[in-house]
Amino acid sequence: MAVAGSELAVKATERYELTLEQAATLAEFDDDPEMVRALVAAVKAGRFDHVAQRARDDRAQVAAYDQTTVQLTEQGVTVVAEPEWDDPKVRDIRSLRHGDDEATPESQAECPGRAAYVHVDRDWDSEQWEAKPVEVCTDHSTHGHTDPSDESRTTGSGGGRKKPVEQMTDEEREQARQQRRLVIDHNKAWTSATEVRRAWLAEWLTRKTPPKGTFGFVAGMIAAHPDLLPDLDANRLAAEWLGQPPASGYGRSDALADLIGNADERRAQVITLALVLAACEAHVGRDTWRRDGTTGWHGPYRGFLADHGYTLADIEDYAASNQTV
């Protein structure tokens, strides 16, 4: 029904070889022709799911931001843009002092520079994008505040020795700003890719027989990276992928144990593979893309998925390289 109600989706389906699910996704973005074109192009590149998920996440972030901004405005709060890392004036009120006392939103309620910016981030428990206001003073020194961190503020990114902000040239500051923006954008891309990858794994692991190379991969990961397996979150992920309830105890899943006990030999091997893959995923963090992907378990893990039909997102290709940030 969603496809039939979208002229763009109907035309794209007639012109390109789209699945019903892809056509429904196009209908979802019927009000954004540019995004529809990007999605159609992604079909050819095999990255449709990645582009769609990033678009959904972007929309969810904007919606969360707008909702919180409206609420703050209705409360009479001045909303400002989130400051750059080296902003000389805007500071989080909680990082400031006023005289001998720590500044708080309550104690600085009458500060002329009081405002707030809206920060949107992923809540990993609810798996939703949430917007939170951060109260600031828009000109802390003018309004009588001091920031104890001013004397030690550095670039805060990259390797090597960090240079204090006040010693940086304009060019170095701009490079640091661009680096920070890149990290923020790549963090968002990684979050979207993780969503797609885990959905793909859940679908792929419904199979009844183990894929080619399972034994070598599982044995190799256990032998070379035994530290992966004890992660408590691994059983939760594996149970979720395999359609089982979450662990009933400290890292233990009775449902998974029962599932293996009732499975035939081939399906039990698939479940074992799921446990190892879940152990890898449990060690994936927001900063995983920043590490050298040619060392440790990262390379073999992503290589195994790619060999079996998973299309890496651009950020996952980056993560598989030896590039670091």
Describe each model-derived feature in a short phrase.
Residues 8-325:
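Accessory, typically intrinsically disordered or conformationally flexible segments
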